[in-house]
Amino acid sequence: MILLKRTKIRGVSVSFVSLQRRTHSRLVNPIRQQHQQITKQRSSKILKNAHFYDFRSLPKVPTTQYLEARELTRDILYSGYRPVMYPVKENPLFRDKKRKSLQTLLTMNEKTNAEAKTIDEKKHKNILFGERGTGGIMSGGVNGTWKYNPTVPNELLPFNWWSTSSMGMEYFPEWKNVPPYMMRKLKPFDKALQMRLTHKSKKKMK
């Protein structure tokens, strides 16, 4: 609706055109209110995030966006995680009792104690390194590295798929004599594939 009002101000007649668009005013006012509310909410959220979620002190790490599932599963399988059983740490509550017992044994018979000590050392070595010095399920891991750092030795990488067990607890020294270029070409054993090859060879023979 357009209404024309004619008024006289100080003897001067001025025509004022007042545009009254009711539909427009009804729509504009709530939109402005909504916009103001949204801006207030956003500003409050920004302040909250800046106050509570400040990640600037955290170190930067490479992105995990382009990781492949196969590589992840392979790394998890060969990463060498296992339940830690050996070596068992000495309980400080029983140190004095052990020292007293050792002193009494030394006074009674030094020779027998020395022999027992050498046997204990051998057992300790077997526990850490295994009987052959190559680790094992009852040992501390690959060549005893589980005692200090739970990783496969560098000399066995990247061919540890063949030269070590799946959990990296035992390595097989006979694989050291195999050249790396031959190990690269190796593939896991597939019984079905071998059966197909034998079947084809039999057909050719016929």
Curated annotation (Swiss-Prot):
Record protein name field: Protein SUE1, mitochondrial
Give the gene that encodes this protein.
SUE1
- Keyword Transit peptide assigned to the entry: answer is yes
From the record, give the transmembrane residue ranges.
none
Which keywords does UniProt give here?
Mitochondrion, Transit peptide
Q: Which GO terms describe its cellular component?
A: mitochondrial envelope
- Location, primary (coarse class): mitochondrion
Q: Which GO terms describe its biological process?
A: protein catabolic process
Q: Which domain of life is it from?
A: Eukaryota
Explain the purpose of this protein: Required for degradation of unstable forms of cytochrome c.
Subcellular localization, per the record?
Answer: Mitochondrion envelope
Q: Tell me which residues form the transit peptide.
A: 1-24
Q: InterPro entries from the entry?
A: Pet20-like
